[in-house]
A protein has these predicted regions:
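Nucleic-acid-processing active sites and adjacent nucleic-acid-binding tracks
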Residues: 25-54
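Short glycine-rich phosphate-binding loop at a beta-alpha junction
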Residues: 52-63
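Helix-hairpin-helix
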Residues: 192-213, 225
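Phosphate-backbone recognition surface of nucleic-acid-processing proteins
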Residues: 208-282, 286, 313, 318
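Basic, amphipathic alpha-helical segments enriched in Lys/Arg and hydrophobic/aromatic residues
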Residues: 281-318
Length: 318
């Protein structure tokens, strides 16, 4: 294959457990490699020849990370795309057929047409903390499922569930200990953690999730902060039609943690308790009121981190 320098070259990568399907647009080059160290090295070497403007790969959980790390080490520009955005793009094109090759072509087309912003890798410690928070959430979900089974199983089977619950409890405690140690190992995280936890309702897990999954907090404005976690209401209007404003998008892992934090804050923090009650009295549904409180919480936390100040209820209760 001849090398060609073209600033408009976009690469789409469809990720599978065992294989990567790669399409280079507009050169109409398609090839596959195994999703292992050897295959990824070959893919990066080939892609680098064409000096792409952007390489786009969908976020699949963890399968894409070895390829992304290789791109970062090779100083290749990459974007980790939200699969929902790519799916909507396919819908706009009217594309329903689905094969690995077509998916790679679609992702490359999405890259060329939408030009999504380039991604950056998190520092190792931040990625480690994000992984720990994710793993803790996974363990909590499995623990909840086992607790639910304990309620419906006969006594002779309940005895097989109790040791599993003990195992989950111990593993969760170990994960939490690792999170605390990781925060203590980094002065920047220590400072952020102290500010975040000064707000009643924000505990160590919520603080760790914000630090690792929302590193922009403190450097952005209020609207951007709300949008990043998906609690900014979006208008749905067209002509005379005025639909109900709804939240969408954002980073669900942070939103979920803050939702749980708000459940605590509404009981123990007078500012959010009063806000919640006021919204209910105004006729707002409970879930809408909770989301509004979360939006208020993230705006306040953003300003606290920006100004480097601790939580002081009288100053923010307005």
């Amino acid at each position: 294959m001849k090398t060609k320098t073209n600033q408009n070259i976009n690469v789409g990568v469809d990720t599978g457990k065992f294989q990567l399907d790669i399409y280079i647009r507009p050169l109409d080059i398609y090839f596959t490699v195994e999703n292992n160290e050897k295959g990824i090295k070959e893919a990066v070497k080939t892609i680098k020849k064409y000096k792409p403007e952007r390489i786009v790969i969908e976020a699949t959980g963890r399968l894409e990370m070895p390829f992304i790390l290789a791109c970062a080490n090779a100083k290749l520009p990459f974007t980790i795309a939200n699969p929902v955005h790519v799916k909507r793009f396919a819908g706009a094109l009217g594309q329903r057929a689905k094969t690995d090759k077509l998916d790679a072509q679609l992702i490359a087309h999405y890259s060329e047409a939408i030009k999504p912003p380039l991604s950056k890798l998190k520092p190792d410690t931040m990625q480690a903390m994000s992984d720990l928070v994710t793993r803790r959430n996974q363990l909590l979900n499995m623990q909840t499922m086992e607790k639910n089974r304990l309620q419906i199983m006969p006594k002779e089977l309940a005895m097989t569930i109790k040791p599993v619950l003990t195992l989950f409890k111990n593993q969760i405690l170990k994960i939490e200990e690792k999170i605390v140690k990781l925060i203590d190992s980094c002065p920047e995280y220590q400072a952020k953690n102290m500010i975040l936890q000064s707000m009643t309702g924000i505990g160590k897990i919520a603080a760790a999730s914000i630090i690792s999954n929302l590193p922009e907090l403190g450097y952005i404005n209020s609207k951007q902060a709300s949008a990043l976690i998906g609690v900014a209401p979006m208008n749905r209007e067209s002509g005379r039609f005025k639909g109900q404003r709804k939240i969408q998008g954002g980073r669900p892992q942070v939103r979920t943690v803050l939702y749980m934090a708000m459940m605590s804050a509404m009981q123990s923090n007078p500012v959010f308790k009063a806000t919640y009650q006021r919204l209910l009295e105004a006729g707002k549904p409970k879930k809408v009121a909770i989301i509004a409180c979360i939006r208020k919480m993230i705006v306040i936390l953003n300003s606290m981190l920006r100004d480097g100040v601790m939580w002081e209820a009288p100053k923010v209760n307005n």
